[in-house]
Amino acid sequence: PLSEPKGVEAVVLKISQGNMSQEEIIFTKGDLIFTDIIDPKKRVVYKEQIKQDRIAGQLSKVFKAESKDNIIKLGNDPKKPTILMLTDALCPFCRKEMARIEETLKNNNVDIIMTSVHGDDGHAKSALIYKEIKGAKTDEQKIAVFKKYYAEDNKAGAKDVSAAELNAAKALAAKYFGAGVNSVPYIIELDKLK
């Protein structure tokens, strides 16, 4: 049962066929079934809130077990909150987010994990970013590496990395997509990971 609205229950249905499955959230009250509930006064879309809470729970487990080598840290101000950003160098929306990373750092520390959705070339860029960032000492140097590989004219791809590096980048992304993330950039405050 949901605490609000009173008397309404959320039900998570898992629909499977073969090796594919997806979850659907519905709401019930008595004999009635609703596909979503929206509270305009509180500005809450309950279905989306439940989805995000479920993803945060799964993401928390994966992130807490993540190797420090796979988390690129920008900012180190204990007074600022930290956000987790899952991103892809070939994603146009991720490029926009990365273009304003300095602005984001004014109010947040950022932990970045490369999670490409764009096939081998995207995973290759992830691997190249991790490799090159190991030598970066400052946030400015790390940001320069990101901007290099996020540039639309950067043609780095699968031919530029070993099979092992490519497979490691694929496995890293698969962990986070397996936790329920289905698009990038995916940004969440670390405090929300329970």
What are these regions (language model features)?
Residues 81-161, 177-182:
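Structural alpha/beta surface segment adjacent to cysteine/selenocysteine redox centers
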Residues 1-82, 125, 145-194:
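Non-globular targeting/processing and membrane-anchoring segments
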